[in-house]
Regions:
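N-terminal beta1-alpha1 cap of cysteine-dependent amidohydrolase-like domains
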Residues: 1-123, 136-138, 143, 147-153
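Glycine-rich beta-to-alpha active-site loop
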Residues: 126, 131
Length: 153
């Protein structure tokens, strides 16, 4: 019997404005999650989906010993989930609108994952935002807002 493929899935990140106790008595803090449809799409008797936690050295808890190295060695491939737009700063631009700041924490985390998996010779697949991140990781650029930046498109 062969072992199933172990496919890493990048975490989507929920950043609350500040940690608060919600009505259910649960502290709302930074959360990592996997979109259910992605899990359903990946999972089969031959594939185990493994969410890779985001490691950020700029977080509230300072841990300089955390690393994503082991995931690229242990897993057979990587899927980058969709979600919010990339932070324009990630591809060398300032946001055209204050609401378009993106998620620089997730960008750094996923760019690190891409680098590690590519160096390990492992396949990487991007879903929506993940495709945009792969484009930027390999030197590409993005339009922040196609209707205002490319009205003829």
């Amino acid at each position: 019997m062969t072992r199933p493929l172990l496919i890493g899935v990048s975490a989507r990140i929920y950043h609350p404005a500040s940690p608060v106790l919600d009505l259910g008595g649960v502290w709302t803090r930074t959360l990592h999650y996997l979109e259910q449809s992605v899990a359903h799409w990946l999972m089969s008797p031959q594939v185990l989906a493994v969410m890779i936690p985001a490691v950020d050295r700029d977080s509230i808890v300072q841990r300089s010993d955390l690393s994503l190295h082991g995931y690229a060695d242990a897993l057979d491939g990587l899927v980058l989930q969709g979600g919010n737009d990339l932070a324009p700063a990630t591809y060398g631009e300032a946001p055209l609108h204050p609401d378009w700041a993106g998620d620089a924490v997730r960008d750094r985390y996923e760019l690190d994952l891409v680098q590690r998996f590519v160096q390990a010779g492992k396949p990487v697949l991007g879903i929506c935002r993940g495709c945009q991140l792969l484009n930027v990781a390999f030197g590409g650029t993005l339009w922040q807002d196609i209707p205002s930046q490319q009205p003829q498109a």
